[in-house]
Regions:
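Short, His- and charge-rich active-site/binding loops that engage polyanionic ligands
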Residues: 37
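Charged phosphate-binding loop/patch that engages nucleotide di/tri-phosphates or the phosphate backbone
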Residues: 143-169
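Short, solvent-exposed loop/turn elements at beta->coil junctions and helix N-caps
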Residues: 11, 82-89
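Conserved N-terminal beta-strand and adjoining loop/helix that marks the start
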Residues: 5-32
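A conserved beta-turn-beta hairpin within the catalytic core of GNAT-like acetyltransferases
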Residues: 41-45
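Unchanged
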Residues: 54-77, 87-141, 163-169
Length: 169
């Protein structure tokens, strides 16, 4: 199939999405989270995993490796796809988010301007000011076995801008 036969022409009123990755790096029973800088437009002062936009020449797995290395300085292993979100934020463009977990043998992290990195015990993570979807998804992810298939999640927002997460069965 040629590039022109892929059906990527959005003039037919199709909904476009931006691909992103989100990664949770584990070391023992701790999870690496970033407290986003107060000057950030998206999720200032809130805790989230690391990640970002998938570049045009990347696949989701390569992007996850790159984002982890860029934002933490860590080399990781056992990078596993845990969830795929389809996010409808009531705009012309949505987001497809690939959520990964990874293991790190090191706790030596690099500073960056995105925020501050913190190793947080898994059993106390819900006590932090997390990005709004994490209290819903992290318990599922932490309970997964390495061979479990990824979760598929549709995320939307109601008229009061409250999040709704629907997990595929």
């Amino acid at each position: 199939m040629s590039a022109s036969e892929q059906g990527a022409d959005a003039t037919a009123g199709r909904w476009l999405t931006i691909p992103r990755t989100l990664c949770f790096v584990m070391n023992g029973s701790d999870v690496l989270l970033m407290k986003r800088s107060p000057h950030k437009r998206i999720f200032p002062n809130r805790y989230n995993g690391v990640g970002g936009h998938i570049e045009r020449n990347e696949d989701p797995l390569s992007s996850a490796h790159r984002e982890i290395l860029e934002e933490t300085g860590l080399e990781v292993h056992d990078l596993l796809l845990r969830a795929v979100y389809n996010i409808d934020a009531n705009q012309e463009t949505g987001i497809v988010l690939f959520v990964f977990t990874a293991q790190s043998d090191s706790r030596n992290i690099s500073a960056n301007d995105e925020g501050t990195l913190h190793w947080i015990p898994r059993d106390s993570i819900l006590q932090y000011d997390l990005v709004e979807d994490l209290p819903f998804i992290l318990p599922h992810i932490f309970a997964m076995n390495p061979t479990d298939p990824p979760l598929f999640v549709h995320v939307s927002y109601d008229e009061d801008d409250c999040i709704s997460m629907r997990f595929a069965k």
